[in-house]
UniProtKB/Swiss-Prot annotation:
Disruption phenotype: Essential for sporulation, decreases sporulation 100 to 1000-fold. Negative autoregulation by this gene product relies on DNA both upstream and downstream of the operon's promoter. Signal peptide: none annotated. CDD domains: Cas5_I-C. InterPro entries: Cas5_Cmx5_DevS, CRISPR-assoc_prot_Cas5_N. It comes from Myxococcus xanthus (strain DK1622). Keywords: Antiviral defense, Fruiting body, Sporulation. The lineage of its organism: Bacteria, Pseudomonadati, Myxococcota, Myxococcia, Myxococcales. NCBIfam families: cas5_cmx5_devS (TIGR02586), CRISPR_cas5 (TIGR02593). This is CRISPR-associated protein Cas5. Induction: Part of an operon going from at least MXAN_7266 to MXAN_7259 that includes a CRISPR operon with transcription continuing into the pre-crRNA locus. CRISPR (clustered regularly interspaced short palindromic repeat) is an adaptive immune system that provides protection against mobile genetic elements (viruses, transposable elements and conjugative plasmids). CRISPR clusters contain spacers, sequences complementary to antecedent mobile elements, and target invading nucleic acids. CRISPR clusters are transcribed and processed into CRISPR RNA (crRNA). Has a role in fruiting body development, sporulation and aggregation. One of its GO terms (biological process) is sporulation resulting in formation of a cellular spore. Belongs to the CRISPR-associated protein Cas5 family.
């Protein structure tokens, strides 16, 4: 298991059913963290490392701000996106100056090639070996990561609140998002728990395998 310590100046990790007020989770869901790790290593196929375990923890108590912004909608297919009724103002919550830890464990990845865990380590230690494009974000493309540090043993630099699986937990976060509809979206139930060391591997949410695999 390895981890990354990250700082993100501005982000919104949108709650799945947020509508008029676009509320944010206090930390990025496993699906968002998985996407960010794929981006770091330059992987464009999100199926590539299914089966790994990923989660996040928050090191501080970031401020939550509310802003007014324009969101695109699909009310009228005859009108261009972002125009007329296909755009409307909404309030959005933003997480300000978040300090995070993102864990990754690849021992359950079925693919025999280089694991996501190993690729993350290589990307941090040998950035010139990675081919990628664009900024590195944790969520929307504007939610850029400012600082990143490898924690090779997975131990956080200080106590943090981590999202860990728990059958009786009160928090449900996506581990896989269906970007076409909602049918294929998968969730994990857990809770935020204070950790001082690398968490138990089996309590990290697992990115689900494709149907029929494994």
């Amino acid at each position: 298991m390895i981890a990354l310590e990250l700082s993100v100046p501005v982000a919104c990790w949108r709650k799945g059913r947020a509508r008029e007020l676009v509320e944010t989770e206090v930390l990025p869901p496993p699906a968002t963290c998985y996407g960010a790790l794929l981006s770091l290593v330059g992987e464009q196929d999100r199926e590539r490392h299914r089966g790994c375990r990923v989660t996040a923890g928050v090191l501080n108590a970031p401020v939550i701000s509310t802003v007014l912004r324009t969101f695109w909608r699909s009310k009228n297919l005859k009108v261009a996106k972002g125009n007329d009724e296909n755009a409307a103002p909404d309030q959005q919550q933003l997480v300000i100056d978040a300090r995070l830890v993102v864990w990754c464990d690849s021992r359950e990845e079925p693919d025999s090639g280089e694991s996501l865990e190993d690729r993350v380590v290589r990307a941090m230690r040998e950035p010139g070996s990675v081919t990628r494009a664009g900024g590195w974000s944790l969520g929307e493309s504007t939610h850029l990561i400012n600082d990143a540090r490898l924690l090779p043993e997975g131990r956080p630099p200080a106590g943090c609140r981590a999202f860990l699986t728990a059958s009786t937990g009160a928090l449900t976060l996506p581990v896989w998002v269906d970007h076409v509809g909602t049918r294929g979206t998968r969730y994990e139930v857990g809770r935020l728990e204070e950790v001082l060391a690398a968490p138990e591997v089996q309590r990290l949410p697992r990115i689900p395998l494709a149907e029929g695999a494994g």
